[in-house]
Amino acid sequence: RRRLRPVKGRIAVTGFRVGELLEQPNLGSVSCEAGLNGVVGKGLIDARVDGSVSQLEFNGYDYDSLCFGGRLTEKTFNGHVRADDPALRFDFQGEGGFNPERPHYDFDLDLIHADLARMHLNRRDSVSVLSALVEARASGRTLDDLNGKVTVGDVVYRYNADTLRTTRLTLDGQNSAGSKYLSLQSEFADATFRSRTDYKTVFEYLRSSLEKYIPLLYDERKARKRAAGAVSVVDDYSVLSVDVKHFTPVADAVADGLQIADGSQLRLLF
């Protein structure tokens, strides 16, 4: 039987330069406090945790009013995270599994307000505000073994020229070592991808093909360098299908002048 020991305590730090410690230039200082109350043993922890972040500098913006709480074990965290910052307000509730072989995610996120321009995440538009509801039920370490579904609903994106809205967007993944499947369904377009090749190889193949057939989109020297180590999909095939419904609102939000006709279809077999 494992020997368990009670543990209880709190810690507080002010102006800790965590970015320097982790060698992450976009991450600055942090001020926070946290507490833990539970039991620990050899390879085991079961405790209630809570805390708050009064200051966190990231990407040139100072966040505040973040708090969290829940139950922490050696393999899971089940609880909530809330933000009430002027640029970021959200309510996260759910569970995350830390199993290194197959982590899982089961959560609901109410993204009440995210000012992407103020947080320096969108430098093109002076107005860039997003809100949405997100449900995720998935597992996997990477895209290659990702299985589950992510649903995004009640999306409102306000930018300089207009406001983009959608009621539902669904991403479904069914992936294993020998089979890849991704499906995206929305009011704007539906897309399906099937393959037996890992995604990294597929992405490299698509990029090298674009550099070959549309060289003006890429730096010539970099393209030649990558072409020397270009990959190919051997004894396999991949299929990408895209059916455009009404994509104009998305195109306007992504890039000025981008136009994709409603009803367009794309079928790629490679």
Give residue ranges: language-model regions.
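Interface amphipathic segments
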Residues: R1-L133, S139-F270
